[in-house]
Amino acid sequence: MIILALDPGRNKTGFAFVDFDGRLLASGIFLTDEREKFFDELESSSPKFLSWLKEGSTENFNEPVSLIIIGNGTTSDEFSLYVQERASCEIISVDEKNTTLEARELYWKIHRPGLITRLLPEGLRVPKRTLDDLAAWAVALRGLKKYRDIRRNRL
């Protein structure tokens, strides 16, 4: 099961592909104005997302996305409507409050800080890139919890 999480913003959108256990498979960032191009790529027979990838790889994607999780921030209403028009799978939205802070923690889990950086308090460590994709991963982790709760309550 491949899950796509999206953290839409005014100018750029973070995306993360995760498995059902929440493990990051691939993530990246695209300009929000390029959402049509992103979904065209998603619907292609072998999506690569190469120009947008920041982490991981889509090389071994051999199944379609079965769940989309969207962060419900500032620009999410219009974005969610667009996704509903394009997607053929279940879509859920989650609160994205503080996902940027969680993204910093996730960044340092993937990219262990060097010795000198480790000496700094976590709040003073500055990642070497923007983290919109990892905020989408944080959205995915929240969304998976919500999805499991919904499924459990249906039983």
Q: Could you say what each language-model-derived stretch is?
A:
Residues 1-6, 10-155:
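Phosphate- and other anionic-substrate recognition elements at nucleic-acid/protein interfaces
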